[in-house]
Amino acid sequence: VGIPYATQGLLERKTVPLSIHGWDLRGIDPLLSMGGTILGSLSKGDTLAHANEILAGYQAIAIDALIAISGNGSLNIIHQLAVLGHWNLIAIPKTIDHDVAFTERSIGFDTALNTIVDAINRLIFTAASHDRVMIIEVMGRSTGHLALYSGIAGGADVILIPEVPYTIRGICHHLTELRDRWQKKFAIIVVSEGISTCLEDANNPSISTNTKYGQGQYIAEKIANCSHHLIDTRVSVLGHIQRGGIPSALDRLTASMFGKVAVDLIAQNKYDQMLAWQNGKVVTFPIQDVIAKNPSLVNPQGDLVQTARSLGIYIGE
């Protein structure tokens, strides 16, 4: 069975029947091509404040083992509940932020990445038509994986991520060099939603990237001031479009392999493990070890950052 809306379902003692054959009477499994979640998600309220009721709901439903499909924040909460209630818990990483430790893949990341790259492909044409700098703000919370991967794959000129400090002077110099040296009159900037203020503003606590319109607008305003309004910018905040859509083939394969191994672990009575993808196969790690290492940040000296620099992308100082 499935538990609808995570711990809310345990509170209300609700279950949803699941079948290997899917919901279609003709035997067509719609789940592979469905985005999001058929069970629903929960991201509000103080879950641990209702711990006793949740634990009672778990016992009332008589669950033998629980597979939690979640990102790092939800994993921390569900693990605390599992420890309190002595649950048999298996975790599967599912987040577009790609910030769960130890795993090279998380369900949803590849689909979101493809959505962003598709958006960049479309926005390049309007940027080129009007000789504009298009600033694309993407999700990622406190990590820059989505911005870094999509920026490289989409041919961005500037990528800004939380893990690498940057200067507005450096951005404007790069944009000017693109125009003067390479005669490129437009540019694409990919901005992660979790970036901090530029180095020029780092010592000024009164300045924040949390403007009414987000970090993309902060960068646009800084570029306008730096260039004396000679650089024409437009901001596109992709928002929740990144969290939906038809799952990519890679995400379908990853989810299927994670699911198979999760069931195998339950059959072997091996619990308190999170599944991870490393070196082309599914492996396991103790959940507590994963939580201790979360979130998984971009390595500023890593191969992807160095690849971006080698491609002539400005990615900070």
Give the predicted meaning of each segment.
Residues L11-V16, H50-N52, I77-A82, V100-R105, ...:
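Short acidic, glycine/serine/threonine-rich loops at helix termini
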Residues T211, Q215-E317:
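C-terminal non-catalytic interaction/assembly regions of soluble proteins
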Residues G2-G9, S43-K44, G71-S74, I92-H98, ...:
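Short, ordered loop/turn segments at secondary-structure junctions
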Residues I3-P4, A82-S106, L113-T115, L160-T167:
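Short, acidic/small-residue loops that bind anionic groups at enzyme active sites
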Residues L10-A68, G73-S74, R105-D118:
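Glycine-rich oxoanion-binding loops at beta->alpha junctions
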Residues A68-S70, N76-Q80, F109-I231:
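Accessory alpha-helical/coil subdomains and C-terminal extensions
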Residues M34-G35, L84-G85, G154-G155:
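Short, structured coil segments at secondary-structure junctions
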